[in-house]
Regions:
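Conserved recognition-core residues within compact binding domains
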Residues: 1-90
Length: 90
């Protein structure tokens, strides 16, 4: 059986600045990845490459691409900040 990270990497398109998730997605466009349980792909990959998301924070896609899993395009922010950024123009 292959390791979760190996399976994950096979599902990512690394051809651009955004590392686009190429497998299952939620209705809102976030990638989904099963590693024991179903997880948001960007959050799972962040935890594997950067570490835990600080308690009380969530990951904002600074690139505005919900399918992106590139850790450089993710920033831990409060829920309120994430909502504020979502409502602002790119």
């Amino acid at each position: 059986m292959r390791e979760p990270l190996e399976r994950f990497m096979e599902k990512v398109n690394f051809s651009g600045d955004c590392w686009e998730w190429g497998a299952a997605r939620q209705k809102k466009g976030y990638g989904q990845f099963r590693a024991g349980t179903m997880r948001q792909a960007h959050r799972w990959f962040w935890e594997q490459t950067v570490g835990p998301v600080p308690e009380g924070l969530e990951l904002d896609h600074t690139c505005k691409n919900r399918a992106c899993v590139n850790p450089i395009h993710l920033e831990p922010v409060t829920h309120e900040e994430n909502i504020r950024r979502a409502d602002s123009p790119s």
